[in-house]
């Protein structure tokens, strides 16, 4: 049985780097603002990407425009959709039935829920996270980019802790790397 406080967290399998810390912060933000739907967003400076864009009007999230539906002007928007959503469960099952496949790909876009919720005066917002955490991995090139970013972050982390890395680019870490005294 669904209660008034139940929340659904939508996660895609192609975002392996999202952390518990980020998800927890997004869920706290969702509760604090008493939202009905929240989208985890990210700033992507490389405009040649396949992410949906978040259209903001008057400082508020207005809708998400999927890649195939974007105009040239919309492709310039750097605020992108990670694919992660937080939704009050009591609304989800009612509103999901309202999604139509009236788009170029004739697909049912879950992101259309944003516009549906807004039109029905529900509280909708977005929560920003780091690109590396929410970057989708759809092919070997994406995986290589994510690994490169991870290695750069780990090198910076250990350098800040005072670890000597004579040639940082030649050092590779795993997620569970522990380094003792230098």
Regions found by a protein language model. Give the residues of each.
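Short hydrophobic-aromatic micro-motifs
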Residues: 63, 84-87, 135-136, 165
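Conserved beta-loop-beta/alpha segment of the NTase-like Rossmann-fold superfamily
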Residues: 1-58, 82, 86-89, 94-99
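Short, flexible, basic/aromatic active-site loop/helix in glycosyltransferases
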Residues: 57-75
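A short glycine-threonine-serine/GTX helix/turn-capping micro-motif
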Residues: 73-86, 100-104, 132
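A general structural signal for well-ordered alpha-helical segments in protein cores
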Residues: 23, 61, 89-92, 110-111, ...
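A generic structural signal for well-ordered coil/turn residues at beta-strand boundaries
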Residues: 50, 60, 80-83, 130-131, ...
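Left-handed beta-helix
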Residues: 105-182
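Generic secondary-structure signature for well-ordered alpha-helical cores
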Residues: 4, 31-32, 59, 90, ...
């Amino acid at each position: 049985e669904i209660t008034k406080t139940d929340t659904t967290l939508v996660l895609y399998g192609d975002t392996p780097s999202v952390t518990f810390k980020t998800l927890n912060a997004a869920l706290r933000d969702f509760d604090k603002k008493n939202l009905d739907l929240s989208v985890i967003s990210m700033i992507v400076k490389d405009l040649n990407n396949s992410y949906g864009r978040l259209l903001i009007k008057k400082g508020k999230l207005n809708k998400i425009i999927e890649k195939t539906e974007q105009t040239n002007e919309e492709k310039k928007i750097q605020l992108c959709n990670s694919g992660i959503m937080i939704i009050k469960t009591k609304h989800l099952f009612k509103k999901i039935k309202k999604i139509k496949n009236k788009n170029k790909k004739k697909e049912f876009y879950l992101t259309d829920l944003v516009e549906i919720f807004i039109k029905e005066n529900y509280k909708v917002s977005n929560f920003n996270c780091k690109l590396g955490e929410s970057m989708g991995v759809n092919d070997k090139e994406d995986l290589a980019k994510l690994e490169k970013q991870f290695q750069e972050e780990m090198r910076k982390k250990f350098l800040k802790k005072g670890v000597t890395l004579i040639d940082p680019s030649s050092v590779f870490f795993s997620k569970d790397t522990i380094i003792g005294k230098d």
